[in-house]
Amino acid sequence: IDSQAPDLLARYTELIEKFPGMTTRTETMKSGAYGVYAQKISGRFKDEFNGQSNPLFEVVKKYGLWNKKAFDKSIPESFFSLPEEQIKILLSALWDTDGSIYFKKHSSGKNPPFLEYCSVSEELVRDIQRLLLRIGVVGRVTSKKTSYTYKGEKREGKTAWRVTVGSAEYVHRLLSALSLHGHREERRIKG
């Protein structure tokens, strides 16, 4: 995980180190963000450690999440039947890593907040929309073609998929349900 939010990095480190024999290492990225990486205590992260299966690797493998590319990501089907509190934890973790909180500019002078999760995986975004419904929040899915410039040449990128929560009622409900780390805008909303 890479982030500039110290509380998010601390939370990630805390969770990884709950797995027996696991620790983390931190590196400073060129962007100024910090990268935190999971690894076994005695060396680099591998799928085997001390002759036994690495428990973190086993969890990731069990749910079919190992070695997935960004556009192949999805929520495992069994997660949709989790209790509501666990759904909230999952949504919090997803929003901490790839979610955003913005303020819309409005002609009335009011700038209402909205929340957005973005991915190149349509399936993941639709899965998140489905999880939001489990906690009584309606999100709208949209897509947008992206582009980038490489060596002066404009190229077409992947389609970006977004689930957006914009209704004041649903924004309030979602922010009340989530335990977010590292979102300055959430602190601004909650005062």
Residue ranges of model-derived segments:
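Internal intein/HINT superfamily modules and their associated LAGLIDADG
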Residues: 1-191
